[in-house]
Amino acid sequence: MDHHAQPGQPASAEFFPTDPTGLPEATRPALLELADGDDLHLQIGPVAKRLEDTTVRMLGYNGSIPGPTLKVRQGSEVIVHVTNHGDLETTVHWHGLRLENKYDGVPHETQTPIPVGGSFTYRIRFPDPGLYWYHPHIREDYTQEMGLYGNLLVLPTPVTGRPPTAMSF
């Protein structure tokens, strides 16, 4: 029995694969600058991650942990196509964004989960500037710990009639 398993509970390896053999190495997250109307493809899938002297099996968006950082301008709309090659059904929750309910990523409430091998298309609007994040809302204890999360940077709409303020992100 796995030393982390609780009495009466099966070890996690009985539920989720753990072997990293043959998996691509996880990469660092890319900074993706998206314009209004752009399409983004996010692929969820297993990756190998080196942690000191051990290689472990994790999950990534587009092969990276964390997932890509998305940089958009306030008021933009982006189409996000998510394909699930992960371990279990999933959704993507766009944490803190005000958006259409059907794209909020709450399983069985606002969206049917994306099955393994399936896809879902989100239409995401960015009404407010700020720093946000995205992540699954199914088995968060597992999926986020395995690497499924990423940042969203929403830049404010430039104010007209005044000189722009220097911004460095």
Specify the residue positions occupied by each region the protein language model found.
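Histidine-centered copper-binding motifs that mark active-site loops
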Residues: 1-169
